[in-house]
C-alpha cells in the first residue's frame, strides 16, 4: 500500500511539473480515459509492428479510431530525443533500459495500475534497475541480448547426440568441461563438415567486452553484484576464476586457425565472429543475438539450431548480459491519459503476441507471469526467450557524484579486452590480469566520480 501511495504522489507531482492533468483510471472498464480530440503517436523501430499497434488501438477503441499513429524511430537514443524535441516527438516511445534514467526528468511517471503490471509481469531486476530511484517511468517489454546456441545439424552429422537436458542443452555437451574435452579431442583429428575442417569449437569473444562477459562469470562472479556503484568487484576471487576459465579455454585450443595454431586473443572480436558462425556454420557452439536473422540463416543454410542456457563450469552456469527494451511516456505529451491507455494496451497478451509476429523481439516475462504468450509456430523465439531467463541484467547504476556517468562505463572504458586477450595468449597470468583490472578500475572511478 505504501508503494502504491508513493507512486500516486510521484505521479501527481510529475503531472504538475509538466503542467498537465494526471491520467484518469476508470475502474469499471479497467482502462484509462481518453481525452476528447486526443491525437497521439507511438515510436517503434518496425513499420509492421507500428501498423499493427495502430490496428490494435482502433479495434480496442472504435470510437477513437485514428487517434493513434506511429513513427519509425530507433530505440537507441530515443529518450534523448524526448528531452531534445519534447512535444515534437512521439507520445509513447520504445526505449533501451540503460538510457532511461539519464532522461527521467523528461518522462511521465506511470500510473499505479501500470506500476503493478511492471512489478508482476516482468522480472524484478529488469524493472527495478532501469527505473530511477523513487519514480517508475519504464516497464521492460522485450529482451535485448545474446543466448547460447548449438548447431544440431552439425553435431548430428559428426556423430553426436543432441538429446537435451532440462535447460535444453545437449546432454553430451552441457558443461564446459565436456566442451573443452571435445576441443582437445579435435586437436589432432579435425572433423570435416560440409567440405571444411572445423577449427572452432566456440568462437569466444575477448576484445569485445560486452559479449566477453559470460566467460568472467564462470566462477560465479557478477559485476556490481553487491550493488555498490563504486565497486565492480574485480578484486574478488570469483573474478580471477573467470580469468582462469579463459586460460583453460586457451589450453584446450577452443579456437585454432587453419594452420592449427591457436588464434591470437586480439582476433577474438566477438560480434563479427558471431555473424560468421551463423552464416557459415564455423563451429558447433556460439552465441546469437536478438538482432540477428536467425531463422533466415537457418533456412538459407539448410540447418537447425537449438537455444539454451549456457553450459556450467565447475558447477557454475555462465551468464551473458541481457538488457531490455520497453516503452516510456513522453512527459511533454498533451494527452497523458490517452498515452497511458496506449501504454496499457502495449503490455497486454494480444500486444505481445503481435510484437512476436511483427518484430524481432521476444517478451521479457517473469516465470509465472499473469500474462502468458503463445509463440505460435515460432519455436526459435520460444527457445530463446526461455534461455534469456538465465541471463544477467546489465547493471544500470550511475556514479553517486556524477549522474552523467554510468557505473558500467568503467568496464567499457578501461582496456578489459586487452587483459582478457593477454590471459588467453599467456602474456599475463590470471592473477596479473586481475591486479591490472583492479588498479585501472580504481583510477577510473576516482577520476570520474566527481
Predicted features along the sequence, with ranges:
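Extracytoplasmic ligand-binding clamshell segments of periplasmic binding protein
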Residues: 74-82, 197-198, 220-300, 310, ...
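Helix-loop-helix "hinge/cap" segment bordering the ligand-binding cleft or interdomain interface
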Residues: 19, 131-208, 222-260, 331-337, ...
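Extracytoplasmic "Venus flytrap"/periplasmic binding protein-like
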Residues: 41, 56-125, 135-138, 156-165, ...
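Long, aromatic- and glycine/proline-rich binding clefts that accommodate carbohydrate-like moieties
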Residues: 308, 357-418, 422
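Immediate post-signal peptide segment of exported/extracytoplasmic ligand-binding proteins
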Residues: 20-40, 187-193, 450
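Hinge/lid segment of periplasmic solute-binding proteins
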Residues: 21-31, 94-147, 156, 177-180, ...
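Extracytoplasmic/periplasmic substrate-recognition and gating elements
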Residues: 65, 134, 298-367, 401, ...
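Short, polar/charged alpha-helical segment
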Residues: 25-33, 45-65, 149, 153, ...
